[in-house]
């Protein structure tokens, strides 16, 4: 049955529905699959924590987090990213964690086509090269646009302290 804000399958008593972005309203969930989109935009860890806790009520439950980089390196997204990186580089063993991080490595030239392709595994499929290369050119020409471009299209974490001012141009 397809409802306005959910799907319901009577034969399995299963429901698929979007939930509130307010963690305080989510207590009591019994989650089999949770998809948290754009974790970098979460101001607090409340939703992440209540959803993660709700996974303990079912066998083989799964929480899938999808996000780009962001600007808040003190938030839940950067914390989760750090944990995933530690699992991937084997400095932490946690069989409950699996992750894939597409982005640039230190030393990669963010202005190159290779960087765009590396950070965007769906390049040319759902990521439109002509759009992203145009945005890249804008970010190169307008340094104040570089931080947003790098977080959204190259998965590079930037902060307000990151200097994207074109100092050679400033000094002229």
State each model region's role:
Residues 1-32:
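Inter-Walker segment of RecA-like/P-loop motor cores
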Residues 3, 45-172:
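Non-catalytic, compositionally simple segments
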Residues 37-38:
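Walker B catalytic acidic pair
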Residues 23, 41-42:
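Residues immediately C-terminal
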